Regions:
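Hydrophobic, Leu/Ile/Phe/Ala-enriched alpha-helical segments that form helix-helix packing faces
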Residues: 40-45, 117, 121, 180, ...
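Metal-dependent nuclease catalytic cores that hydrolyze phosphodiester bonds in DNA/RNA
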Residues: 1-87, 97, 219-221
C-alpha cells in the first residue's frame, strides 16, 4: 500500500519518507511483552493461542535472491515459535485494535520473512545456503488495552491477546515480488495523486526554489 514512487526512491536511492519515531511507551510495552515470552509456550499467555515455544525475539533475516528476480528480503521479524512437529510459526506482534483487515495488511510482510527463513542468504565463504528454518504457520498476536484498575499504588492496564491466523500463499508472494522487481527495474513511476509525501515534496520544491527571488538569511532563531 506504500506509494510506488516513494518506495522506488527508498530502495533505489536511499531517500526515505520523513517519519516520527514510535512513542517510547509503545516500544517499552512491545519489548517487555516479547522478552517475557521467549523460552515459554504461548499457552502461558493464553490457551487460545497456538501450542508452541517462543525461541527467538526480533530476529534479523536476509534471503537469497528470489528466483527470476533481482530482489532479496532483509528485515526483522518479531517472534519465532517452535511447534510440536518441529516446524515453526512466525508471529508479528502488534499493539493495536484487532481486526480482520490486519490479515490483508501484514500477510505480504510475514510471507517475506517466511521466504527469508526458508531461503537464507549464503554465509560469506560458507556453504551454498545458511540454516534453513521451515515455517508452516503465520499469525498476528495483537494486544489492545481494554481495562484499567488501581491497586497497591499502581495503575494496572489489562492487555488481552487476540490471535489472527494469516494464510500462507507462496504463489501470491512470488507474484508480488515479481511486480516489485519489474517496478525497480524500470524508470521512476509517476507521483501518486493521493500520496501526501509526494505532494509535500513537489510543492515544497516549487516554493523553496524560486529562482532569483529573495532568500531570508538573517533568521530570528
Amino acid at each position: 500500500e506504500e506509494c510506488k514512487l516513494c518506495y522506488y526512491l527508498k530502495i533505489k536511492h536511499g531517500i526515505y519518507q520523513p517519519s516520527m519515531p514510535m512513542p517510547g511507551v509503545f516500544s517499552a510495552i512491545n519489548t517487555r511483552l516479547q522478552g517475557n515470552l521467549v523460552g515459554k509456550n504461548l499457552h502461558v499467555l493464553s490457551k487460545n493461542l497456538p501450542d508452541g515455544e517462543v525461541v527467538t525475539q526480533e530476529g534479523w533475516v536476509e534471503s537469497n535472491v528470489v528466483p527470476g528476480t533481482d530482489v532479496f528480503i532483509k528485515g526483522k521479524y518479531d517472534l519465532l515459535v517452535k511447534l510440536p512437529d518441529e516446524t515453526h510459526l512466525l508471529v508479528d506482534l502488534k499493539i493495536s485494535q484487532p481486526g480482520d483487515d490486519k490479515i490483508e495488511k501484514y500477510k505480504t510482510q510475514l510471507g517475506a520473512y517466511k521466504f527469508a527463513l526458508e531461503n537464507p542468504a549464503s554465509p560469506a565463504g560458507g556453504p551454498k545456503d545458511g540454516k534453513k528454518i521451515v515455517v508452516s504457520k503465520l499469525g498476528l498476536l495483537i494486544f489492545y488495552p481494554d481495562r484499567v484498575k488501581f491497586e497497591k499504588g499502581e495503575a494496572v492496564l489489562s492487555f488481552p491477546p487476540s490471535w489472527l491466523d494469516v494464510p500462507i500463499d507462496d504463489e501470491l508472494f512470488l507474484e508480488f515480488v515479481g511486480k516489485i522487481d519489474k517496478l525497480l527495474a524500470g524508470a521512476p513511476p509517476a507521483e501518486s495523486l493521493s500520496c501526501k509525501w509526494c505532494q509535500y515534496r513537489h510543492v515544497g520544491d516549487q516554493l523553496a526554489h524560486v529562482g532569483s527571488g529573495p532568500v531570508q538569511d538573517d533568521l530570528p532563531f
